[in-house]
Structure formats: C-alpha cells, structure tokens
Amino acid sequence: AAFSVEAQTRISLPHTGFMPEDIAVIINEDDPLSRQIGNYYQQARHIPEINMIRLRFSSERSVMTRKEFQQLKKNIDRLTPDHVQAYAVAWTSPYRVGCMSLTSALAFGFDEKYCSKKCAPTAPSPYFNAPSQYPATDYKLRPAMMLAGTSFEQVKALIDRGIASDHSFPKGQAYLLSTSDKARNNRATSYAQTAKDLAGVFPLQILETNFISDRQDVLFYFTGLTEVPMLETLGFLPGALADHLTSAGGMLTDSLQMSSLRWLEAGATASYGTVTEPCSFPQKFPSPAVAMFHYALGASAIEAYWKSVAWPGQGVFIGEPLAKPFAPLLRKINPGRYELTVFSPREGRLRIEKSLSAAGPFKLHSRPQSIRRGKNLIHFKFDEKTDGYLKLQWN
C-alpha cells in the first residue's frame, strides 16, 4: 500500500539515482514530433516546468555544424537550472555534432579531443565507473540521452516502459554473446570476469552464437554484430539495456548497418551506438559489467549506461533516462509495519538509525542486518506518531 506523506517525510532512504527534478528536457519547438515527445515526457515523468528547455532550429538533417551547436549550447547553458544533473533530448535528428555524438557534445561541450583521429585513443570521461550521483556538481558535465524513435507512438511506448520498470526488480536474464564477427567481438574477453563479478546478482548466460531468438526474459543483451536478426521474437522486460558493438549503430536514421533504434523498437528501454567510425576500441562501447553493476545499485538507465563507457565522445545514448528497475522500494504493509526491498550487486549491511528530531542526532535503532547480493526484503516497525524519524542506509 502507498503510505502517508507523513511517513514519507519521516523515513529517509539513500538517493540511488536521478529523480525527475534532476533532468532537464530539451525540445526543438520547430519540430512538431519533438514538441509532442517533450510535452508527453514532462507530463508522464512529472518534470518541473523550470527544467523544460525550448529551442528553435532546423531538424532536417543528421549532423549539426560545430558553430550552430555552440550557439545552441550557449542557450542551453543559460536556460539550465543549476540543480539539473542530466538532459533528456526530445528528438532523433540531428544526432551528431561534427565528429561527436549529440549526447556527448551536450555533456562535454564540443571538443575534437573526444573524437578519434587515425584510430588513436580519445579523451576519457571522468564519469566512467564513478561513484558520483551528481555529475554536474562533481565533474561539470551533464550526461544526455535521446528520447529517440521514428514516431510518437514508438517513443511514447519507450517512455511508458521506462516508467513501468521503476522499482520492478525484474527477474530477467543477461545475455552476453560471443559472435563470429571478430572485429566486433572484443567485449567477449571480459565476459567470464563479468559472470564472476555478478554471480548471485543477475542470471547471466554467455553464449557462443551470433544471436538469440524466442526468449521472453531479456533484461540485458550485449553482442557484437553489424545486424542482429530475430529481435522481433524476443521479449524485453521493462528497463532492458541492449546494444550491438558496431561502428555505425549510432547513425540513428541513415546507417548502412543496423541502427540502435531497432533495439528500442524491439522493446529495449535504452541502447547505445557510435555516430562515426570509432575503430574497435572496447573503451568506446559499454562495459556490460559496469552497466549492470550500477543498474543493480539502483541507478537510472542514463547513469548506468553513461558510467559504462570510458571514451563516449563518438557514442550516442538513446532511451528513457529515468528508468530505475532496481531502485529501493518502501511499502507500508500494515499500520506501523513496513517492508523495504533493496537490490544490491554486493554484500553489505543495512543500518536503521532513529532520532526524535529531523535534524538528529540519529542513533542506531536496531542491530545492523546483512544485505546479500540480489534482492533483499527487510521488515521493520515504525509508528509515525511516536517514533520520530528513521534514516535507512546500506552499503
């Protein structure tokens, strides 16, 4: 059951991922589809009006010039409230600025050090595998994700999936595919370690095959192939992350290879692809282990995916940014009795601290409880009339 506002203000949980107030939505007012997507997203996710950024520019192309982007970026920076940590971009085209992806240009500003010349390494992201939950505050960067799709119906379905995934603790599988495509299979060397690191967290299958079909439990699907067949036979759970390591997947609307949009159309909630030939550096693509670890901590899709790419300059992130399938859930099950669901990628301890005043001091209320890998159910008593305030923390 939902609990009273009084109980919500008296029981505090750790912040595990972005909230609606942390996201600014960027709309192109000259693009009717962008307006429709942005307005629906604001309404569906309860994004504050102050976080809505409305621009005007021509959308009839895939690539924006550096000069044009820098002018837009000045406006975006001016209109972005200081507290905002990330951007949701309400269009599909343009998806690229010069040699950079639009999402990385928004995060870092346009700078050619984030692009590869002659297959050289590019500038790294300080956000890679970072514990930070406030990238704008800690690193002066705001990760971005595109609410991408070829029709309003598609993007609406994507947004609705993201919302449906929140606190849902899906019991899905992680599929890590080692394919016959040598140039695109370089993530496979890390799969065994990933399986070890995430044992007991997600059911994980490492398969030596080019594709899977007829599975209805897909939560993660990481592969390396120019075209991924049989997507229409799969059932993706709300919140699913999926991508195919290939050089042109991020060319959303005009790729000669499979566009990353096909993952979203098939039912994934977020995906990733590169917008220019990146050379086959694994650092330019998501690390499955890092993405799954941060997702399991309760991070949002945009945080987990962004943290999984070491060199994201040429890569575009698409999907529903705020999807949080593993964020903790607190429920009142009876008067004075609560149930907390916590998902964790590691073992730890839960501390319940109590104070008669909201300002503290908080003292240990009961013996710390063990948190195991995966899903944990914790029950506790709390009388909001007499017990003051509780602070729940785990590591």
Q: Which residue stretches match the model-derived regions?
A:
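Low-complexity, Ser/Thr/Pro-rich intrinsically disordered linker/stalk segments at domain junctions
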Residues: 326-395
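Cysteine-dependent hydrolase recognition
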Residues: 8-341, 345-349, 357-359
